[in-house]
From Swiss-Prot:
Domain of life: Bacteria
The species this protein was found in: Coxiella burnetii (strain CbuG_Q212)
Residues that, per the record, bind 5-methyltetrahydropteroyltri-L-glutamate: R16, E17, M18, K19, K115, R519, C520, W565, E609
PANTHER family linked: 5-METHYLTETRAHYDROPTEROYLTRIGLUTAMATE--HOMOCYSTEINE METHYLTRANSFERASE
Residues the record lists as binding L-homocysteine: I435, G436, S437, E488, D603
Gene name, Swiss-Prot/TrEMBL: metE
Record-given protein name: 5-methyltetrahydropteroyltriglutamate--homocysteine methyltransferase
Lineage: Bacteria, Pseudomonadati, Pseudomonadota, Gammaproteobacteria, Legionellales
Amino acid sequence: MVYAHNLGFPRIGIKREMKKTVEAYWRGEISQQQLQQQAIELQLTNWKIQAEAGVDLIPVGDFSWYDHVLDMAVRVGAIPSRFKALNSNITDTMFCTARGQAPNGIETSACEMTKWFDTNYHYIVPEFTTNQSFELHHDDLFKSTKLALENNYRAKPVILGPLSFLWLGKCKGESFNKLLLLEKLLPVYAEIFEQLSSLGVEWVQVDEPILVLDLPPEWQQAFLTTYQQLNFFNLKCLLATYFGSLDDNLSLTCQLPVDGLHIDYCRAPDQLDSVLSQLPAEKILSVGIVDGRNIWCNDLNRSLTLLENIQSSLGDRLWVAPSCSLLHVPIDLDQENKLDVELKSWFAFAKQKVAEAAFLTRGLREGRESIGAELKKNEEVIISRKTSKRIHNPNVEKKAASVNERLMRRQHEHSIRKNKQTAQLNLPLFPTTTIGSFPQTSKIRCLRRDYKQGKIDDALYEEKIRQEIAEVIGIQVKLGLDVLVHGEPERNDMVEYFGELLDGIAITSNGWVQSYGSRCVKPPIIFGDVSRERPMTLRWIEYAQSLTTKSVKGMLTGPVTILAWSFVRDDQPRSQTAKQIALALRDEVQDLERSGVRVIQIDEPAFRECLPLRKAAWQDYLEWAVKCFRLASCGVKDETQIHTHMCYSEFNDIIEAIAALDADVITIESSRSEMEILKSFEKFAYPNDIGPGIYDIHSPRIPRVAEIEELAVRALQYIPIERLWINPDCGLKTRNWEETKEALSRMVDAAKHLRKAFSSEKTPTIDLELQPAST
């Protein structure tokens, strides 16, 4: 029989219950027992939503208090020794691993965090050593599975596969071949399967998303040997791939001794024919035909026609599902009461997407007539979107068509600009700055909420925001920072803020998705041509600059990041949408410069995450991404200093594209990786200024002055002294004021020590060392 199933459901809860509960636990306001009870309630709610929608096989094990990769590491005992020694409680150990601090007060350096493939979700990077051992260490998956079965759900446990788990981790200390760990790891996986089998589970979903990557031959071979060795203890295994095409890994995937294969049709429709021709006759094919990464409703008529053709070949060996876990979309469109009615009709969130998969499955089982009403209603929606006049703006399209190369070049090369900027800005050696945002207190959030709800008028709102800006400027001046920011109190999110002010973009009320841990974001929805009708940031930056003689940065989010962190229209190339955004930002940049702003930051933290997973597609993306950044940034004079910021990025393979952005200063996230990211600059002489993140803002832990100095000295191995900036890893929005002021004070002290220790006339040698400074 054709089944509807799902790969994973959002964890955060319809009202972000996960976020509120876990943060209460971190603050010591609730017990661990209360924490676990909320986990039970959230999972039961998620299972009920899916079952009522008509999903046959319910994913179990997709819930997490922080991250599913971290959960897998804890489950198999891959816990770094620095956490094992300090925590006896497994839950606190997990939180300490992710945050560098546990609710029991234990502190140490957190594990690295990075992007989950090309999404805006972040995972905690497992750490492996040459003497790594594994053991079954956590029973969370078995408890959840038992709970689902007791509540009469047909549970399909979900785990990250062994090869993807190893691939996503990193060697700590001495480098070695991670595949050597399989011998110790596979028995633990077998133990997991044995326990799931004993509970009466029929199917297990094993996620191996790295099968859509360019894999080295030894990793391809490792798939064959690993899955031949794995003992599933009579469980049926659905091997799940997503985010791209199997491509050259298709043949080996079809040889694996598993019972079913899931493919992502939405991201890689061209692979379908090859999969159908190579899939062994006994295997199930799960077709991910409902987009798990975007919010547009499915064209059910078109999808059903495609599935009917597949069914004619496979019969009951066809399953229907979303393309990937629904972790990447909001939970329930029914919670949106303020969206324009026509726009809302075009969307589908997680609850609606599992219903779409179920509708299609029913159509296959019982014939089109059984879902005739749904098909008719859906067809009306599809036509409405295609013919709506609100999507196209002739003025925007004309402006985009007129873009030429001249608009994407600064007046002179960086060396000339550098001299002019140095004379104008009068900055010291090792200039200090922050990335943009300052702590968003409950007072600020309540102020914005009251303003949006009409409880306070424009005048009072402006007065209160100005007070916040003045306070932030005063704190930075007192701390001794060199280039200041206004703190962004008016912004709820670095992308959503611009989404609210640009035409062609819609904002939801409850469209939250998980970014990392308890951090949730509300991505804008780009539904039509994008344009700027009026200045978006000017009044706040002008006011901030009026309070100080030091330079205050204009703060913008770049075109690629706005694109990456939004749900994007799918009726034109993404590059075209990015160009429209870049033109809107260009107007804003020029307005800021005309007002006297001397430093303008255009953040592109998502620049690398948008890189296609397959290298063959990189050149095309990098070409248009670089052009869009330059289109946004190059309309200014030499004297205006352009900054950009990037995070969670490995630069080795795209360093030339980073240089091609031609930003005067780039700040990058690097502290968690202990400056490893700077190895990119060993063989490539990056020509412009760099500010490698000198402390980790994602952890509440405050670094010692000596630690900051040590990282800066390490950075000087790769960056000439006259080009090195001192700054945090990222924005400070999620930190509290006590942490922020103390950490920045230490950062400024470290910069002062560095200025004393290093001559401004000479570039230091690599082996020059500082004595540890006191804190």
